[in-house]
Regions:
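N-terminal auxiliary segments of SAM/dcSAM-dependent transferases
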Residues: 1-31
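S-adenosylmethionine/decaboxylated-SAM
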Residues: 4, 8, 36-61, 72, ...
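General helical structural elements
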Residues: 20-23, 68, 94
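N-terminal pre-P-loop "Q-motif" helix
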Residues: 62-67
Length: 247
């Protein structure tokens, strides 16, 4: 399929201040104002992937579309790496990404990390969520769905990130897309710092909920670590934060 991304007339492409402004506008402006949403909705692969994942996902449509655009049009521009998701809940977004990746990138795996038993104890001075939130993941049914779809590129990893991340990285080696969707500050912090050394040059760091009203703790991690400490600039702020990991 030919690209249906918008052409940003008068803009030059390339990396500036750690981000590709042109590509950020293509996706963000394209989805919000440029008619790109309708083109994604008409894309057969997007429709197929959403159809097999829709009953297990709570991700917003715009966020899902942006993830799809990254997979469909941008990952092949950077070095090969696997996909990791921190915070998979019922597995819908992981299924969606794995379905698309299986069609487009032979050999690429999606590692989906979650306790699959709900949130741990939270600091109510920082995070709005409570211990046990998202406890209805039902890992057994999720695995059955993965098996039925023959998504042998999707690896479900049960446990807290600090207990599983090292083993996952030993298997994966390189990551091209990190989808960080774990809502609370300690988990977002661990995810970012745990994946950063393994990101390929130009890899994508996507924060699903750091702009969500119930996840100010996640926002603080982005502000404190990525922006203030590490000096990163976002390539997108809508529909979610997207940063690049350049070497």
């Amino acid at each position: 399929m030919e690209s249906y991304l918008p052409i940003m007339n008068g803009m030059t492409t390339g990396i500036r201040q750690g981000r590709n402004v042109y590509e950020g506008y293509q996706r963000g402006w394209g989805l919000q104002f440029g008619g790109l949403r309708e083109k994604v909705l008409a894309d057969p692969l997007y429709r197929e992937a959403f159809a097999v994942a829709r009953d297990r996902t709570i991700m917003s449509e715009e966020n899902r579309m942006n993830i799809y655009l990254l997979l469909r049009f941008y990952l092949d521009k950077i070095p090969f790496g696997h996909i990791i998701e921190y915070g998979s809940y019922r597995g819908g977004s992981a299924i969606f990404m794995a379905y698309v990746a299986q069609k487009l990138y032979p050999g690429m795996k999606v590692f989906a990390l979650d306790s699959f038993e709900g949130m741990p104890q939270t600091d109510k001075n920082v995070d709005a969520h409570n211990a046990g939130d998202f406890g209805d993941a039902d890992l057994e049914k999720l695995q059955a769905r993965v098996d039925k779809l023959k998504l042998d590129n999707l690896v479900l990893v049960k446990g807290f990130f600090e207990d599983t991340n090292d083993d996952v990285m030993a298997q994966a080696g390189k990551i091209s897309l990190a989808h960080i969707d774990c809502d609370i500050a300690p988990a977002v912090k661990y995810s970012y710092e745990g994946v950063l050394p393994y990101m390929v040059d130009g890899g994508y760091l996507v924060f699903d909920d750091a702009t969500v009203s119930s996840c100010i703790g996640a926002t603080e991690v982005v502000e404190d670590l990525l922006i203030r400490r590490d000096g990163l600039n976002s390539e997108q702020i809508w529909p979610h934060f997207v940063f690049r990991a350049f070497k």
